[in-house]
Amino acid sequence: QSIIYRHNAADLFLNKNDIENSNVQNYECILITGTSLAAEPSRSAVLYALELAKENNIPVIMDIDYRPYTWESADKAKQIYNLACDYCSGIIGNDDEFAILSGSYESGFNYAKKKSKNCELVIYKMGEKGSITFANNKEIKKGIFPVKPLKPTGAGDSFLGSLIGALLKKYDLQKAIEIGSAAAAIVVTKVGCAPAMPDLNEVLDFMKINNINKGDT
């Protein structure tokens, strides 16, 4: 059994001064998670960073990462997430998370698809059913690498980190998605989150002996 406890976590105390001292204008890309938007002062600090990113034409990728226990309400989460989305070049989340942004589960998919008109990359994840990626006016449907999981935590972080890492190493988008999916599959079979994160060589070795399925997209 895994227990996650977050109360007065250090990352939620990020403030505007931290951003000003970080030379954001020199970054090639900014990656944020929705957790940082859940409370002050980190919410205002991150929104300030997004403003600086926009001023300096720096792409922003957001992992929605909605955790109900960190927000005062779903309505507040919807408001702040949508504000942040206006700055994003990429948005990544699962079906439940896009439901928060759109207001209902039924409208989440169409919301994601609509956002892709203004974003370079939108990934709509569906757990065991795989994912649908919207990019370059195309839809990329991918399944998962079936495994016997020990726990669900860490899958989203490993997917995103490995996806972005693969893109930076010049893998094409379809391959990068598969690498992210493989990393997620590896993490859920191990104890812990950060200690379970694989490096690229481990992911590629895993992909040599495991096949991605067609999903249910």
Summary of predicted features, one role per range:
Residues 51, 55, 105-217:
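Conserved phosphate-binding/catalytic region of the ribokinase-like
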Residues 20, 81, 149:
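Acidic, amphipathic alpha-helical patches
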Residues 9, 34-38, 184, 190-193:
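Glycine-rich phosphate/pyrophosphate-binding beta-alpha loops
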Residues 22-23, 83-84, 115:
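Structural alpha-helical scaffold elements that stabilize or flank donor/cofactor-binding regions
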Residues 1-32, 203-217:
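Conserved N-terminal subdomain of the carbohydrate kinase-like
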Residues 3, 28, 40, 101, ...:
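Residues that scaffold the ATP/ADP-binding catalytic core of kinase and kinase-like folds
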Residues 29, 35-110, 129-131:
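Conserved beta-alpha-beta core of the PfkB/ribokinase-like small-molecule kinase fold
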Residues 25-26, 86-87, 118:
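Alpha-helix C-terminal capping/helix-to-coil transition sites in glycosyltransferase folds
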